[in-house]
Regions:
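Amphipathic alpha-helical hairpins
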Residues: 1-200
Length: 200
């Protein structure tokens, strides 16, 4: 079957193939920026899974007698750039981890949407081998997203909130001290004027 949905399907496959190649480079950087050992492991484990996704996509191309070729995925490229910007921020470690999880989940959700469509199209066109391979990738993307969610809700988000509260607590005494100093300075002239009045 050529033309129509087949061409759109192959186009989406090439987009997904490029996305996985980009993520192969990005995931180790997310791992390196992570403070949590569990989060670092999650990113590195998913990088290994991503290598498998690349291999399976190549099998999908072969099953369709299509040339293995990627097409630049602007969507994932944008998500990766946002992740790089986050890593340049001066956040406390827990907040950085929370933001890295958010970045990782953005890419997972993008891929889940893409693979969900690819599975549906493969089934509609009777490409059972391709559908099975793509479904296996989709299942791993969902599992990776769930793992990140567990890490976020299992302590990292709470640690980030606690860190923000501690920062506010540290700033409050200094702010009160500055405020107190300003009040004293304003009162001083009035106090001296009162003394002059008494001397008269």
């Amino acid at each position: 079957m050529q033309g129509g949905l087949h061409d759109a399907f192959v186009d989406e496959l090439r987009d997904a193939y490029d996305a996985e190649k980009q993520l192969l480079k990005a995931l180790p950087k997310l791992a390196k920026a992570s403070e949590s050992e569990e989060l670092r492991t999650a990113f590195l484990d998913h990088a290994e899974e991503t290598r498998g996704h690349v291999d399976r996509l190549e099998q999908v191309f072969a099953s369709l007698d299509e040339k293995v070729r990627g097409k630049h995925c602007d969507g994932i490229a944008g998500i990766i750039e946002e992740g790089k910007a986050v890593m340049e921020e001066d956040f406390d470690p827990a907040t950085m981890d929370a933001c890295l999880i958010a970045s990782g989940q953005r890419s997972e959700h993008y891929e889940m949407a893409a693979y969900g469509t690819l599975v549906a199209w493969a089934k509609a066109m009777g490409h059972s081998e391709a559908a099975d391979l793509l479904q296996s990738i989709l299942d791993e993307e969902k599992a990776a997203d769930e793992k990140l969610n567990e890490l976020a809700e299992g302590g990292i988000n709470q640690q980030a909130v606690a860190g923000a509260i501690d920062d506010d607590s540290d700033e409050a005494p200094a702010a009160r001290k500055r405020s107190s100093g300003k009040t004293s300075a304003k009162r001083a002239p009035a106090s001296r004027a009162a003394k002059r009045g008494k001397r008269r």
